[in-house]
Amino acid sequence: MSQSVLPTQAGYDRWSQIYDADENPLIELETQVMRQFIGDVAGRTVLDVGCGTGRHTSAVAAAGARVTAIDFSRGMLDRARAKPECRDVTFLTHDLSQTLPFPDGTFDVIVCGLVIDHISTLKGLFGEMQRVGKPGARAAISVMHPAMELLGVQARFTDPATGAKIACGTAQNATSDYVTAICHSGWYMAEMIERAVDDATIAACPRAIKYAGWPMLMAWRLLKKS
């Protein structure tokens, strides 16, 4: 079956209808790593950059954080706002190609899950996330592993109305692009993790078997100097 490619915003607006119910091995891998990297957030100010349907937003809000969440997809934001854990979250519509709309040193923790593989201006975004972090802030960042591009994989879903495969536009960043942007933005890279599809992933998401052994996730734990 052929695949259509939509601009990122339009693609995620459409995907929002089924995103949380869509069986996704990348999310299976990513959730475990990001929970570890995000850490204890009780009483902390948290910014969720590109929050989508609020997967991480709802988790950190339920853990006692004061959360601000931003995304440029109104469809995704509507889904996030509807989650009961997110009733006290501040949601903003914002395009990440623009300067973040917050003063310097606003947040204790910054979360950015499966977003920046759609961003070509990496140095600018990493720099902005560093700017709005307080001294000593930490960040948890994840992307689809660039190795997936060798298999022709990108963020995509099956439209429930038509059965068509729809992909959301990506920036095709290399590992070196991410690492260079981190190093030039003032963050300290405390940890970098790569995760491949393993037996546990396949058990939770059987369709992942065709990617067995392939790196699917890359994630970073970053720190800002105190």
Where are these regions (language model features)?
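A short acidic, Gly/Pro-enriched loop at the edge of an enzyme's catalytic core
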Residues: 100-109
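Class I SAM-dependent methyltransferase SAM/SAH-binding core
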Residues: 47-98
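A short glycine-rich, Lys/Arg-flanked "PGG" loop and its adjoining helix->strand segment in the class I
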Residues: 123-138
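Conserved Class I S-adenosyl-L-methionine
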Residues: 188-226
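A short SAM/SAH-binding and catalytic strip from SAM-dependent methyltransferases
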Residues: 109-121
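Conserved class I S-adenosyl-L-methionine
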Residues: 1-42, 55, 59, 76-79, 138-164, 169, ...
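Short alpha-helix
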Residues: 170-193
